[in-house]
Amino acid sequence: MDDIFTQCREGNAVAVRLWLDNTENDLNQGDDHGFSPLHWACREGRSAVVEMLIMRGARINVMNRGDDTPLHLAASHGHRDIVQKLLQYKADINAVNEHGNVPLHYACFWGQDQVAEDLVANGALVSICNKYGEMPMDKAKAPLRELLRERAEKMGQNLNRIPYKDTFWKGTTRTRPRNGTLNKHSGIDFKQLNFLAKLNENHSGELWKGRWQGNDIVVKVLKVRDWSTRKSRDFNEECPRLRIFSHPNVLPVLGACQSPPAPHPTLITHWMPYGSLYNVLHEGTNFVVDQSQAVKFALDMARGMAFLHTLEPLIPRHALNSRSVMIDEDMTARISMADVKFSFQCPGRMYAPAWVAPEALQKKPEDTNRRSADMWSFAVLLWELVTREVPFADLSNMEIGMKVALEGRPTIPPGISPHVCKLMKICMNEDPAKRPKFDMIVPILEKMQDK
């Protein structure tokens, strides 16, 4: 089978769908030129493939090596329907590439008149200059130039030249495709790992920042008592299910090994510059989480959990809380698979009871509806996002477990958005059977995001 980039170029929708259904495939990877699958589908005008990639979570504003976004390529080649689709999903209409050109520069240069009109109607600036001092209108033939000038004036644009600045891109979420080879290495040679700095140490092990094959990574070295052949076998059998590359809101385990001389099981995952959601909310990062960003994080988490809940069987021993949600460089929240517990790791112990559903504290795991319990955890995360507080911060884990089991609940303070407040209460229904499923709350959060 040809690679995914060829399938996207050729518009082979069936092959692309089969490739996307494999959880070990990363739809945001790049080829040797930094083109993502979405870049190629937009360049070649493959509308069905573009739709499929966007629906599965392809990054809209991803850049290739020349800083072109998919919108640059669709505009250059006159694929009007794809341009409109990208704009519908909030593509950056004035994104600049390495030459300082925005998509409108290319639509004008290549005579894509309808695309140019659509771009201006949606806010593309007609007088923004590239590195060479040229505006998009300078690239257009006379009739189109006059039409765009007239349209821009009607929309209230200032037609004075806007000089090029290196900072045009700041404040936008620009990312590059990920290394497409990382998902090919399930088994990793411990000797290839370069440990740079210890980030944390707790009951479950050590967390390190490291480098592997030229990539920044996080290395998690697990603490396990009485390591045995059976535990080694369980580790090797359970790891592959954590290599989920196919969803943008799930952070996969890249690979695993057992480190010498003492066999410490070791997991490797992507480096996340902002750390966890807990770090962002409670540990004084420079990241500002306003109402809009809080809803975005909630939507990201709901989408990730909706996907995980489609897996059969469910990933066992996964606990949803703000320490197990990581924040990517483009401010995307991702459910971390490296935080899933293995069968040999302290069965029965609860390390974050503040986020655990009361029935999960009172019953055995096999007697608990995991999907409903996860929805309770999500409700606590909503509370955390809007209050910026740690739930039950003044209590010990044992006290928290007792309190939640005995109907102690986080208090919803006044001033919270009524929409968020209502959603929180629905998700935290005392009757697990009455809590919604994640695929039911995703559309609600999408509407809240659009307001």
UniProtKB/Swiss-Prot annotation:
<dbReference type="InterPro" id="IPR000719">
    <property type="entry name" value="Prot_kinase_dom"/>
</dbReference>
<dbReference type="InterPro" id="IPR011009">
    <property type="entry name" value="Kinase-like_dom_sf"/>
</dbReference>
<dbReference type="GO" id="GO:0005634">
    <property type="term" value="C:nucleus"/>
</dbReference>
<dbReference type="GO" id="GO:0005925">
    <property type="term" value="C:focal adhesion"/>
</dbReference>
<dbReference type="InterPro" id="IPR001245">
    <property type="entry name" value="Ser-Thr/Tyr_kinase_cat_dom"/>
</dbReference>
<feature type="domain" description="Protein kinase">
    <location>
        <begin position="193"/>
        <end position="445"/>
    </location>
</feature>
<dbReference type="InterPro" id="IPR036770">
    <property type="entry name" value="Ankyrin_rpt-contain_sf"/>
</dbReference>
<dbReference type="GO" id="GO:0070836">
    <property type="term" value="P:caveola assembly"/>
</dbReference>
<feature type="repeat" description="ANK 5">
    <location>
        <begin position="130"/>
        <end position="174"/>
    </location>
</feature>
<feature type="binding site">
    <location>
        <position position="200"/>
    </location>
    <ligand>
        <name>ATP</name>
    </ligand>
</feature>
<comment type="subunit">
    <text>Component of the heterotrimeric IPP (ILK-PINCH-PARVIN) complex composed of ILK, LIMS1/PINCH and PARVA; the complex binds to F-actin via the C-terminal tail of LIMS1 and the N-terminal region of PARVA, promoting F-actin filament bundling. Formation of the IPP complex is dependent on protein kinase C and precedes integrin-mediated cell adhesion and spreading. ILK also interacts with LIMS2/PINCH2 and with PARVB and PARVG which may substitute for LIMS1 and PARVA in the IPP complex; PARVA and PARVB compete for the same binding site.</text>
</comment>
<comment type="similarity">
    <text>Belongs to the protein kinase superfamily. TKL Ser/Thr protein kinase family.</text>
</comment>
<dbReference type="GO" id="GO:0000287">
    <property type="term" value="F:magnesium ion binding"/>
</dbReference>
<keyword id="KW-0472">Membrane</keyword>
<feature type="binding site">
    <location>
        <position position="202"/>
    </location>
    <ligand>
        <name>ATP</name>
    </ligand>
</feature>
<keyword id="KW-1003">Cell membrane</keyword>
<keyword id="KW-0067">ATP-binding</keyword>
<dbReference type="GO" id="GO:0030017">
    <property type="term" value="C:sarcomere"/>
</dbReference>
<feature type="binding site">
    <location>
        <position position="204"/>
    </location>
    <ligand>
        <name>ATP</name>
    </ligand>
</feature>
<dbReference type="GO" id="GO:0034446">
    <property type="term" value="P:substrate adhesion-dependent cell spreading"/>
</dbReference>
<keyword id="KW-0007">Acetylation</keyword>
<dbReference type="GO" id="GO:0007229">
    <property type="term" value="P:integrin-mediated signaling pathway"/>
</dbReference>
<feature type="repeat" description="ANK 3">
    <location>
        <begin position="64"/>
        <end position="96"/>
    </location>
</feature>
<dbReference type="GO" id="GO:0007052">
    <property type="term" value="P:mitotic spindle organization"/>
</dbReference>
<feature type="region of interest" description="Interaction with LIMS1">
    <location>
        <begin position="33"/>
        <end position="139"/>
    </location>
</feature>
<feature type="binding site">
    <location>
        <position position="272"/>
    </location>
    <ligand>
        <name>ATP</name>
    </ligand>
</feature>
<dbReference type="GO" id="GO:0001725">
    <property type="term" value="C:stress fiber"/>
</dbReference>
<keyword id="KW-0547">Nucleotide-binding</keyword>
<dbReference type="GO" id="GO:0005813">
    <property type="term" value="C:centrosome"/>
</dbReference>
<feature type="short sequence motif" description="Nuclear localization signal">
    <location>
        <begin position="363"/>
        <end position="371"/>
    </location>
</feature>
<keyword id="KW-0963">Cytoplasm</keyword>
<feature type="modified residue" description="Phosphothreonine">
    <location>
        <position position="173"/>
    </location>
</feature>
<keyword id="KW-0206">Cytoskeleton</keyword>
<feature type="binding site">
    <location>
        <position position="270"/>
    </location>
    <ligand>
        <name>ATP</name>
    </ligand>
</feature>
<dbReference type="InterPro" id="IPR051681">
    <property type="entry name" value="Ser/Thr_Kinases-Pseudokinases"/>
</dbReference>
<dbReference type="Pfam" id="PF07714">
    <property type="entry name" value="PK_Tyr_Ser-Thr"/>
</dbReference>
<feature type="modified residue" description="Phosphoserine">
    <location>
        <position position="186"/>
    </location>
</feature>
<dbReference type="GO" id="GO:0005737">
    <property type="term" value="C:cytoplasm"/>
</dbReference>
<feature type="modified residue" description="N6-acetyllysine">
    <location>
        <position position="425"/>
    </location>
</feature>
<dbReference type="Pfam" id="PF12796">
    <property type="entry name" value="Ank_2"/>
</dbReference>
<feature type="modified residue" description="Phosphoserine">
    <location>
        <position position="246"/>
    </location>
</feature>
<feature type="binding site">
    <location>
        <position position="341"/>
    </location>
    <ligand>
        <name>ATP</name>
    </ligand>
</feature>
